[in-house]
């Protein structure tokens, strides 16, 4: 009999913890829809008790997504658990994921609790959560570095209280595959009631082994749930990569012999959406979703590919959503063709007004660029002004700049602040510097730019440039993304996008009080 492997995606929760990767409610909802198309089993939508913004995002996703289980993280206390349950009320299938640290280091230095106090807190929190929802996951934070005897006692107690999934995290990415696999196996063998719960793995990539450790937890340890993120997004070195786990299990079914619900045809679209939403560019040689993942430059390899694809390809690019023959749109393309392409790409805009706004932007772009590729469309709809233009504090209107060799560039930027048009102008070390300084003449954000990067969306000189700007202010870090055939305009859009996110974060912090 073939076992099922549950795919638990935490892009919207653990992935978002990567500095600068914070997402708006609308962005999270758009990604959640794509995860549902991908047929992810469980979507961890956020940490409902952490902020009003996170609560609203979890609530919106729970009210919208019908096929996937929707999960909220919570600490092991009644307030967090109650908040999670409230946010999940509209879900078809709801899960509360509660956690508390169990390693000696964390208990002593962070929690300042005794092992017995932690055990009791874990037990009571799972009992409380089970009174609110039928599906409860428990995680012993820093589980891999916990004492095995003590950890077995904790896990036995929470299963007795009704935990349906036991997730054992390698919180700091310290594990190596064989040892981690046997660690999971030992726990399952020594916890008397282990058969009453599904066992899960959650691995971080600090030593580059998150995927290998997760697969070892499955094959050696007997885990049947893997927690992962699109593109391996996550704090520090990231998390276990969903696309790599899925395609490893599918490609080597002869070895793993596991079934999954996942539809891999939507993997590339999910990867692009997360990358363009967060501004975290996928490296070209990234397995499965990198631009070079299916490219062959060696003459010997190319010759073999022409004779028989299987000589150098172990999986087909089109099986994960790479399109062999792309439909290219242009200025003569109509609204229906545009709407169909959005659907094919897994983009679901909430209203006809949003579609109309997106189509108007598409036509503007088509007047400047003869061919519109999928990447252009995804960049266009990832602009938050499409879906919540009424909520923007700052909006781009126009830009003019003058620069000559040997002269200091000058820029004039017209933008809106709370709906009112403002004209800023400034000199700078270059056209981009002048444009951003022109914005700051009125905004005076006090933010520090910690990252500025430019990426060509497609391969030609006619390509749009996609600019990512990362700003830091008072401990808050945000990414803004802007796209335009003019790199200077794209930079101004990205800067205003980042300022909007800084403002949104400040509002959420103020609301929390």
Swiss-Prot record:
Q: Where does Mn(2+) bind?
A: 14, 202, 204, 239
Which organism was this protein described from? Polaromonas sp. (strain JS666 / ATCC BAA-500)
Keyword presence, Thylakoid: no
Q: In which pathway does it act?
A: Amino-acid biosynthesis; L-leucine biosynthesis; L-leucine from 3-methyl-2-oxobutanoate: step 1/4
Q: Which CDD domains match?
A: DRE_TIM_IPMS (cd07940)
Q: Which HAMAP family match?
A: LeuA_type1 (MF_01025)
What gene makes this protein?
Answer: leuA
| Coiled-coil portions | none
- GO CC term (a single one): cytosol
Enzyme class comes to: transferase
Q: What role does it play? A: Catalyzes the condensation of the acetyl group of acetyl-CoA with 3-methyl-2-oxobutanoate (2-ketoisovalerate) to form 3-carboxy-3-hydroxy-4-methylpentanoate (2-isopropylmalate).
Q: How does it assemble?
A: Homodimer.
Q: Which residues form the Pyruvate carboxyltransferase domain?
A: 5-266
Instruction: List the InterPro entries.
Output: 2-IPM_HCS-like, 2-isopropylmalate_synth_dimer, AIPM/Hcit_synth_CS, Aldolase_TIM, LeuA/HCS_post-cat, LeuA_allosteric_dom_sf, LeuA_bact_synth, PYR_CT
* Catalysed reactions listed for this entry: 3-methyl-2-oxobutanoate + acetyl-CoA + H2O = (2S)-2-isopropylmalate + CoA + H(+)
For this protein, the Enzyme Commission number is: 2.3.3.13
Identify the keywords attached in UniProt to this record, alphabetized: Amino-acid biosynthesis, Branched-chain amino acid biosynthesis, Cytoplasm, Leucine biosynthesis, Manganese, Metal-binding, Transferase
Give the chief site where it resides.
Answer: cytoplasm
Protein's recorded name: 2-isopropylmalate synthase
* Cofactor(s) listed in the protein's UniProt record: Mn(2+)
What GO biological process terms does the UniProt entry carry, in alphabetical order? L-leucine biosynthetic process
Q: Which family does it belong to?
A: Belongs to the alpha-IPM synthase/homocitrate synthase family. LeuA type 1 subfamily.
Q: Out of the domains of life, which is the source?
A: Bacteria
Kindly list the places in or outside the cell where this protein is found, as annotated in its UniProt entry.
Cytoplasm
Keyword Cytoplasm listed? The answer is yes
Gene Ontology MF term list: 2-isopropylmalate synthase activity; acetyl-CoA C-acetyltransferase activity; manganese ion binding
Give the start-end ranges of region Regulatory domain: 395-513
């Amino acid at each position: 009999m073939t076992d099922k492997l549950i795919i638990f995606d935490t892009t919207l929760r653990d992935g978002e913890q990567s500095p600068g990767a914070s997402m708006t409610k609308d962005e999270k909802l758009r990604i959640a829809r794509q995860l549902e198309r991908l047929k992810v089993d469980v979507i961890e939508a956020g940490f409902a008790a952490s902020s009003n913004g996170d609560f609203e995002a979890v609530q919106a996703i729970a009210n919208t997504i019908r096929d996937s289980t929707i999960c909220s993280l919570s600490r092991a206390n009644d307030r967090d658990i109650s908040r999670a349950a409230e946010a999940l009320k509209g879900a078809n299938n709801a899960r509360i994921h509660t956690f508390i640290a169990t390693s000696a280091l964390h208990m002593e230095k962070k929690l300042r609790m005794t092992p017995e106090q932690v055990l009791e807190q874990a037990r009571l929190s799972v009992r409380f959560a089970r009174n609110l929802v039928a599906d409860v996951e428990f995680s012993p934070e820093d589980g891999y570095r916990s004492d095995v005897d003590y950890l077995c006692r904790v896990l036995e107690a929470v299963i007795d209280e009704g935990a349906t999934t036991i997730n054992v995290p390698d919180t700091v990415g310290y594990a190596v595959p064989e040892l981690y696999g046997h660690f999971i196996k030992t726990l399952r063998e020594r916890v008397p009631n282990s058969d009453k719960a599904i066992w899960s793995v959650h691995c971080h990539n600090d030593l580059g082994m998150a995927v290998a450790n997760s697969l070892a937890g499955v094959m050696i340890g007997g885990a049947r749930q893997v927690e992962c993120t699109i593109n391996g997004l996550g704090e520090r070195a990231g998390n276990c990569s969903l696309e790599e786990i899925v395609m490893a299990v599918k490609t080597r079914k002869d070895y793993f012999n596991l079934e999954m619900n996942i539809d891999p045809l939507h993997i590339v679209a999910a990867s692009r959406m997360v990358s363009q939403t967060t501004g975290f560019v996928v490296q070209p040689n990234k397995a499965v979703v990198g631009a070079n993942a299916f490219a062959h430059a060696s003459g010997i390899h190319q010759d073999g590919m022409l004779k028989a694809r299987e000589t150098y390809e172990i999986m087909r690019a089109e099986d994960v959503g790479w399109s062999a023959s792309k439909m290219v749109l242009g200025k003569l393309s109509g609204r229906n063709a545009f709407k169909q392409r959005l659907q094919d790409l897994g983009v679901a805009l909430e209203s006809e007004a949003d579609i109309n706004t997106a189509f108007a932007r598409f036509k503007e772009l088509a007047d400047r660029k003869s061919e519109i590729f999928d990447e252009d469309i995804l960049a266009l709809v990832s602009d938050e002004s499409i879906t919540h233009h009424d909520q923007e504090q700052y909006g781009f209107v126009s830009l003019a700049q003058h620069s000559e060799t040997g002269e200091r560039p000058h820029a004039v930027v017209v933008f809106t602040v709370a709906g009112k048009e403002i004209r800023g102008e400034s000199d700078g070390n270059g056209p981009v510097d002048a444009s951003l300084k022109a914005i700051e003449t009125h905004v005076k954000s006090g933010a520090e730019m910690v990252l500025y990067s430019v990426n060509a969306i497609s391969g030609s000189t006619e390509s749009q440039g996609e600019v990512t700007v990362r700003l830091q202010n008072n401990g808050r870090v945000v990414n803004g993304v802007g796209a335009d055939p003019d790199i200077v305009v794209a930079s101004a859009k990205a800067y205003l996008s980042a300022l909007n996110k800084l403002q949104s974060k400040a509002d959420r912090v103020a609301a929390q009080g």
